[in-house]
Every structure is written in C-alpha cells, then in structure tokens.
C-alpha cells in the first residue's frame, strides 16, 4: 500500500534502497551527485558508477527495477505501507538525523506523527520490580496525557513501556531490527498485530529480512530519531538501551532517566552514567511533559490526571500566563477532582474489584476468549493463557480497563525476546 506518493516515484526509492542497502550511510554521499533517486537510477543504469563506492558495487549491480516493482507488489498484497524519504507522510524528525532511512515499511499509519510528542522509552530486559512499577506508572501517565510511546518489542522494559501506554489507550510505535513479516521469534506475530492497531510497527528493512547484530544498533538510531527524547528507565553498562541514548544525544534529543534506588548496583550503572552526563531525572511524568508543554500544548490532554496532582504548580496555569504574554490562545483549564479525604485512598481502576470474574483460572488469569468474541484466537504452546485479538478496538480497550493488564501482558510475555540474537 503506497502512502502519499505515486508508484512511479516510489519504485525509484525502492530500487535505490535495494542498490545501496537499507541502513547504509554511503548512499547519502552518492545521492547529491546524481540528484534524485530517479536520476540516480538513470545515471547508474547508464554506466555512471563514479560515485558508487567499491563496497557498494555488488549491490548496485544486482539491483533491478523489476525487483523493485515486485517488492512494491509484495508490500501492497501484504498491507504494508511504504514511505520514501520524499513522501509527505515520512516522519520529519527522521529527515533531520544523520543517515535517515531512505524507505520505511509500516504496519499502521504514520499520519500525525510530525507534530506529536513522541518519547522513545525502554531499558534492560531484566528490570527490578522497582523499575517496572515506576516505568508502568510514568508511561501510563504520559500516554494518558497524549504522548506517543515508541520502543522495541523485546521482553523486559520495552514491553512494559508499550503495554502501559496501551492500557491508558495511548498511541504506540514499535521499531523492529528486522522485516515486518519476519516473526523472530514466531510468537511476536500476535504482539505486532496489537501494536499496529494501537499505532504502528516500523522497520527500514525489507519485509522478510531477518535480524542480525548490526541491525539492532541501526534500529536504535531510528527509534531515537522519530522521538523528541529518549527515556531510559534502567540500564547497566552493557545495556543496548545506552546506544539509543547515544544516538539521541548525537541527534540533539533530550535524555530522561529514572533515578536508581540502588546506587551501587551494577544494573543501574548505565543510568547513573547518563544522569552524571546531564540526563534529566524523572520522578513522575511531569518531568518529561514540562519539557514540551510550551510548544505542544495543543497535542496534550488537559484532563490527564498527571496535571491535577494537588500541591504542585499547575502546568496549565503556567502555560496560560505564557500564552497571554505571547498572544496565543490559552489551553482550557483542567477539570478538578474532589480531593480524597484524609486516610482515604482515591478510587482508581487499579483499586476497583476485579476478582469477581468467573472467567478466570485457578491462578487468577482471565480466559479472554470467554469475554471477547474473535475469529483470531491463539494459544501459545508454552503459555496456557487463551488470548484473543479483535478488530473491535473499543471492545479490547474496554475489556482491559475492567480486567487490568491481562490481554497485552499475556501476548507480550508469551513472546520470546526479539532482541536476543546471537
């Protein structure tokens, strides 16, 4: 499926990407000499290899327009959207980074991404309970406030970030280190379907490309590139999340970290290093929202609970004053909730009774097939929970709000780690 441009233009970008390779920075050295992707095809096909490096000769000679057109047909038949560098819906922030993808493949849509508050969030695959709890709360609050959460699809903090945002009915983006139709491992197919319905799954690699060690680091530059900032929740010295932070710093993006609760634990050494280098410590979602509210107030939700915490300066009051000075129309004030009585806990979805369901097994898990009708019910061989995917997004979200984290927890935890590649 083509998005925003004709096949006559897209086919030249497809050929160009095939000729030089998806994440190859050398193609951007060659393109200015040739002009456009179309002109590059015409000149190179005519024998002008003067700006093709020796490393790229084999790929350039192997690429043909026939192969490019067949790849476009394949993507159209598999409902894969394609966005070339010249596409009006191509993420503008990606255009500004070093070595942007010449072509993006997507399940889902990228429309509206250019003026959205996108935060790349993630961390270690083996987080502490403290980090999981804090990450869940912050990502949920960010999503409720209108922030788009972008991450990988690995088990651990990547899945925690995505799951928490989806529970808050927020938009999410997952960037893969392989092709969209490469299910590595195979269980991730279901997780990708859910994420695509709640936002988009992206890759710069051709649909059936398998992951390699080089693809993971290249993926992280795209992850940080589509975002305004990187939120690293927990990382040791060798954590792959640090490469996302490194790319974010090189791209001029903000870096945020959760303060560790064990200063001398090596599992937090990477985050401590980022904080020492000037990363912003995040105590709640407002530490991230404060950074962007002045410019992106129109994209945020004024009724989000995070803006109503008693005793703190209200973001909307501050912005109303700023807007009056600049002549801008102020955002509407948030609706206030009645404060909880002393010693009384505020009522939340989490504190509501969820144990009365008769659709649970002995361990308390919900058999979603008993609650949601669907033609796409999967039973993982090593994970006994029955879960369902539904085309009715509202039905899924309403079920989650009533039953907690069951649906996406089980889908993501049933999947092995896509980033675990030897």
Predicted regions and their residues:
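Short, small/acidic-rich helices and loops at N termini and domain boundaries
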Residues: 1-88
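Glycine-biased, small-residue-rich flexible motifs in mid-sequence functional cores and linkers
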Residues: 2-7, 84-422
């Amino acid at each position: 499926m083509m998005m925003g441009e004709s096949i006559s233009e897209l086919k030249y970008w497809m050929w160009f990407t095939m000729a030089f390779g998806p994440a190859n920075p050398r193609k951007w050295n060659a393109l200015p000499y040739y002009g456009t992707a179309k002109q590059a095809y015409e000149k190179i096909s005519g024998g002008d290899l003067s700006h093709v490096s020796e490393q790229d000769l084999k790929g350039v000679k192997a690429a043909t327009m026939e192969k490019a057109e067949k790849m476009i047909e394949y993507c159209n038949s598999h409902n894969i959207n394609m966005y070339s560098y010249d596409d009006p819906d191509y993420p503008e922030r990606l255009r500004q980074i070093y070595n942007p993808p010449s072509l993006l493949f997507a399940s889902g849509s990228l429309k509206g991404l250019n003026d959205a508050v996108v935060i790349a969030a993630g961390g270690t695959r083996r987080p502490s309970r403290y980090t999981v709890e804090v990450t869940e709360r912050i990502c949920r609050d960010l999503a409720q406030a209108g922030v788009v959460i972008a991450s990988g699809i690995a088990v651990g903090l990547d899945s925690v970030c995505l799951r928490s945002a989806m529970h808050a009915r927020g938009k999410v983006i997952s960037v893969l280190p392989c092709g969209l139709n490469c299910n590595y491992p195979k269980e991730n197919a279901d997780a990708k379907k859910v994420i695509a319905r709640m936002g988009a799954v992206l890759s710069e690699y051709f649909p059936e490309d398998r992951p390699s060690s080089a693809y993971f680091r290249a993926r992280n530059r795209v992850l940080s590139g589509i975002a305004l900032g990187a939120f690293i929740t927990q990382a040791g010295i060798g954590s792959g999340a640090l490469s996302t932070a490194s790319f974010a710093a090189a791209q001029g993006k903000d870096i945020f970290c959760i303060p560790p609760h064990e200063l001398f634990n090596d599992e937090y050494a990477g985050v401590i290093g980022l904080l020492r280098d000037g990363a912003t410590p995040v105590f709640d979602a407002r530490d991230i929202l404060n950074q962007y509210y002045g410019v992106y107030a129109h994209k945020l939700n004024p009724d989000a609970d995070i803006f109503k915490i008693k005793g703190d300066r209200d973001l909307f009051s501050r912005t109303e004053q700023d807007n009056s000075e600049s002549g801008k129309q102020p955002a509407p004030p948030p609706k206030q909730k009645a404060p909880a009585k002393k010693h009384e806990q505020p009522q939340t979805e989490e504190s509501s009774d969820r144990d009365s369901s008769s659709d649970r097994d002995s361990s308390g898990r919900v058999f979603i097939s008993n609650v949601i009708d669907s033609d796409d019910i999967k039973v993982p061989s090593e994970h006994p929970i029955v879960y369902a995917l539904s085309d009715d997004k509202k039905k899924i979200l309403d079920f989650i709000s009533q039953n907690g984290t069951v649906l996406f927890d089980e889908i993501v935890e049933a999947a092995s780690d896509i980033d675990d590649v030897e």
